[in-house]
């Protein structure tokens, strides 16, 4: 029962997290391209200096919503994965390849958590601050253009870090193929000679 419960939590959390990260990673370029092709005009952002940039702002807002939802999924699934990884050594077979793979999975999880934390705490605030500065100073090209450059660079870094998290989670999936139930050995009956 313990093995099944731990594995259920592990696989649900890992697959949900990996799928969510992959969805955001694949959908962000599609959102940007589709909105850019339709060339919208945002009525609340009035500036003659933002010719052609309304689509970037709208697409950025859509992707921001996706990334904020992804953060919630990362926190919940990351917590469940941590609990499952702590419980796994007590319920899985750690002989031969199992022990090494458990260590690799834990290392990949910690690396993915560190990258996601860095993105959340250090990169994402730069994305939002530079976007706000760009919109607030749209009529001042000397301020708006460097803010747009910072926004684009921070957003690219954000997507690259999201891709790194996806790669680390894929590594966890690949190193999970060795997870097995512990073998139960029944003692062999002793033979008595007649």
State what each model feature region is.
Residues 2-96, 135-138, 145-148, 184-194:
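Interfacial loop at the N-terminal end of multi-pass membrane proteins
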Residues 10, 97-109:
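Hydrophobic alpha-helical transmembrane segments
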Residues 15-22, 108-121:
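Hydrophobic alpha-helical membrane-insertion segments
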Residues 66, 146-166:
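Individual transmembrane alpha-helices with interfacial aromatic-anchor signatures
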Residues 77, 84, 162-179:
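Alpha-helical transmembrane segments and their membrane-interface junctions
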Residues 116-123, 159-169:
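Alpha-helical transmembrane segments of helical membrane proteins, especially in multi-pass transport
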Residues 120-136:
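Functional transmembrane-helix hotspots
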